[in-house]
């Protein structure tokens, strides 16, 4: 059976680079999942993709999954399958650009090599995507990127990261004008107010200890530091996602 290659995204509305993605220069059809649904968390993407694969894809079909708001098709994707197969894996994740700080990125995401996987763009054969998506959804942690990096380090040997950036490249925030040779390029996230607040709520669980240390180092007066620490603690307790906190 000849496998199909399909580009898929998850987007509940038009935002950021969405229109450029679906109306791309190469007339590549993009399957949009999740349209009109309320956003509940990163695992929405895994749920939507798994449902779609189970309903309509064969095990040998190659799925290219990209972020709906930040991704551009940069080159003619006619050689997608050949490029993917050249990596010798069943699932390939894009490499995280570690934009803000290598130390911060690695405080959040499990890593066992010189690269961190980014869940915004990845590709794989349907048979193997079903395996990792089911695993991702079975975990308590609601951050798909944390879960996928843990799988790469501790669970599956059929996953690789696109370190050569031939198929995918995530452009760092500090290098926004970089010219890429990858087929799919993701640019620094377009941040609306809701998306920015959501990011704070989702990632506070990884950084709260470091923030508390920073407060006490920056404010040497015990009363000031204590008040700020209490206020920050209340924000963390009341608002922050703690599903991935160890």
Q: Predicted regions span which residues?
A:
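Short beta-strand-to-loop acidic/aromatic patch adjacent to the donor-nucleotide binding site
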Residues: 61-69
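Conserved donor-nucleotide/metal-binding helix-loop-beta segment in metal-dependent transferases, i.e.
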Residues: 71-112
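Acidic, Ser/Thr-rich intrinsically disordered and amphipathic helical segments
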Residues: 17, 48, 79, 128-131, ...
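A generic structural motif
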Residues: 30-39, 93-97, 161-168
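Structural alpha-beta junctions
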Residues: 23-32, 86-90, 153-161
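A conserved hydrophobic position in a structured secondary element of the catalytic/binding core
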Residues: 68, 75, 124
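Catalytic core and acceptor-binding pocket of nucleotide-sugar-dependent glycosyltransferases
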Residues: 115-208
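N-terminal anchoring/stem segment of glycosyltransferases
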Residues: 1-62, 214-243
